[in-house]
């Protein structure tokens, strides 16, 4: 009797796992480059990349950053959603709580689906003061055309903001004397 119950339970579990959505699989979002150095005052762009996804309909993502070191300029949809024809929608959600330290983006393919790998979003920052500024994933949600979550994982990065180095002007003769 006990063996029959175990066998029945195993059959039910096997049936449930085989009935799961076939397109649903874990996806990964990551910041690229994961480690970069910029100068104070520079405006630069980080890419939010996604791995191979065959059926991507929409994404909501949020990335936390150091508001003392970085200022968010913009966050826009990447080529995963914008290339390949078809209409798409994007909406940058502004962080209204002080300090503004989160970049949010909703993006969806309106007709058809998107495919990865590629750039899912571009995040543009301005470097404010020297130091290390981690960029961390605080929210990642990706859905396929059946509205099934792709259960995305995500990994952040770090931006090293460097202070400008002073340039000393010397003539060739001064350099020769200084080097001796």
Roles of regions detected by a PLM:
Residues 1-8:
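Positively charged n-region of N-terminal signal peptides that target proteins for export
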Residues 5, 21-22:
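Intrinsically disordered, low-complexity serine/threonine-rich segments
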Residues 22-180:
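Acidic, low-complexity intrinsically disordered segments
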């Amino acid at each position: 009797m006990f063996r029959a119950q175990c066998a029945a339970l195993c059959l039910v579990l096997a049936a449930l796992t085989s009935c799961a959505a076939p397109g649903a699989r874990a996806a990964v979002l990551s910041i690229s480059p994961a480690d970069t150095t910029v100068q104070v005052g520079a405006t630069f762009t980080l890419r939010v990349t996604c791995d191979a996804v065959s059926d991507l309909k929409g994404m909501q993502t949020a990335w936390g950053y150091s508001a003392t070191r970085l200022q968010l300029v913009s966050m826009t949809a990447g080529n995963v959603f914008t290339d390949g024809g078809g209409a798409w929608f994007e909406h940058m959600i502004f962080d209204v709580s002080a300090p503004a330290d989160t970049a949010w983006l909703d993006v969806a393919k309106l007709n058809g689906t998107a495919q990865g790998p590629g750039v899912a979003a571009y995040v543009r920052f301005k470097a404010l003061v020297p130091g290390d500024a981690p960029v961390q994933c605080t929210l990642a949600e990706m859905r396929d055309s059946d509205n099934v979550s792709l259960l995305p994982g995500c990994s952040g990065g770090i931006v090293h903001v460097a202070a400008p180095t002073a340039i000393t002007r010397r003539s060739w003769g001064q350099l020769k004397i200084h080097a001796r």
